[in-house]
Amino acid sequence: MKRSSKFTVALLVVIAALAVIYRVMNSAPSDKLAQSAQVLEIFKDGGCLSCHTDNPELPFYAKFPVAGDIIKVDIDSGYRAFDMTPIMTALENQQSINPVDLAKTEKVMLDKRMPPAKYYLAHWGSTTTDAKKDIIMNWVKDERIKLYADELAEDRAAEPVRPIAQRVNVDIRKAILGNFLYHDKRLSKDNTISCASCHGLNTGGVDNKQYSEGVDGKLGGVNAPTVYNAVYNFVQFWDGRAKTLADQAAGPPLNPIEMASESFDQIIAKLQKDKNLVKAFNEIYPDGITQNNITNAIEEFERTLITPNAPFDKYLRGDDKAISEEALNGYNLFKKYDCATCHVGPNLGGQSYELMGLRKHYFADRGMELTEEDNGRYKETKQERDRHRFKVPGLRNVALTWPYYHDGTRATLEEAVRDMGIYQSGVTLNDNETKQIVAFLNTLTGEHEGKTLTNDNKQ
């Protein structure tokens, strides 16, 4: 046999051997493992923890000059976009998975983004094969079905967006009292401002101002989020400083820029002069009018402020005629361009903190001086990763809640959508795509107390 022929045969043998090794190294986890254990194994073998954590598992070549610089860029980018520590912890402890983590994982699988080629070429066992992808996608669907007790059409059971519930369980007596307190201006220092002043129920749960006016005309530094469907948020306020609706209700009355009361003792002293109100409290709360009881009643009322039966909810439940073809195309674009990796669940948001300017520096382009409010979650944690990171706003009734963003700088949905594409998704939407996504967002306006929500303010 000629030398060249021997070389060719040897080369083919080596290639065949490498192919076998590659297939073995990239085989899917055993189906004898629990579903969560299979997913955990795929994540670990895929090298997810090499980038998506604050304590990455670095390969040996990370110490080399050029390779080390490349790896650092990848780690910084990966960790900014997705911290996988919570999802790994949840899998290891058989806990519920955050819906945003599910959505991000699903999108990565659909787009076959991870791991990047430069990683799996050096780590043969990290490739995401079709078998691994199927395991992940089935797990995402099963987790969503477990997470949400809703009724979706069978072919929509795995959608990242869910319908608003028809009702929530509340203590009706507390809710009625909370409704009264929500509109009571005595919670403010000079009896001029109530919760409804900035979160009007007849104006989409907001005031449609860039910054709300408090006592003496003082302006806040952040755009007022809607009160509708706030019960679905995992925390309250843009910076997440309130864990519950009751915690949130305790903030504005004592905020010197908002309602400016000196203390709840001052508020209680005023309310105790109202004999009917004292009686109402005593009938519900044995200890009468207290700070905790005031905020508890407001919380119970705000739990009733849900807006079910939006056209898109009807579509999710199986009514194909509930939305237009244009709106459906918009929803598909909404998913294609990663919007549905953060705007998930019944409220299409409110489930995570995300970086404003993930793909392009928003604040550098904005042309306004940075404020303390622009620091977002960093205000509370003082962790650098949280700078410019905000609670994702819910998109329910978004057509009624202009202006947009935490700084209220976008007056229309068209502006907000186009710029989200640039700064969060890294895409430039054309006019038709923008129009379609806006059409989808318009299908998210729901009903309150049996009537379609409207806004008395005119844009």
Give the label of every model feature segment.
Residues 47, 52-55, 75, 109-113, ...:
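Sec/Tat-exported extracytoplasmic proteins
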Residues 33-47:
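Short extracytoplasmic/periplasmic juxtamembrane "stem" segments immediately C-terminal to an N-terminal membrane anchor
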Residues 1-35, 112-176, 260-328, 332, ...:
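Post-cleavage N-terminal segment of exported redox proteins
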Residues 41, 56-86, 156-251, 315-418, ...:
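Short glycine/threonine-rich turn/loop motifs
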Residues 40, 68, 72, 102, ...:
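Extracytoplasmic/secreted envelope proteins and their assembly/folding machinery
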Residues 65, 103, 108, 243, ...:
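Alpha-helix N-cap/helix-start motif at coil-to-helix transitions, marked by capping-box chemistry
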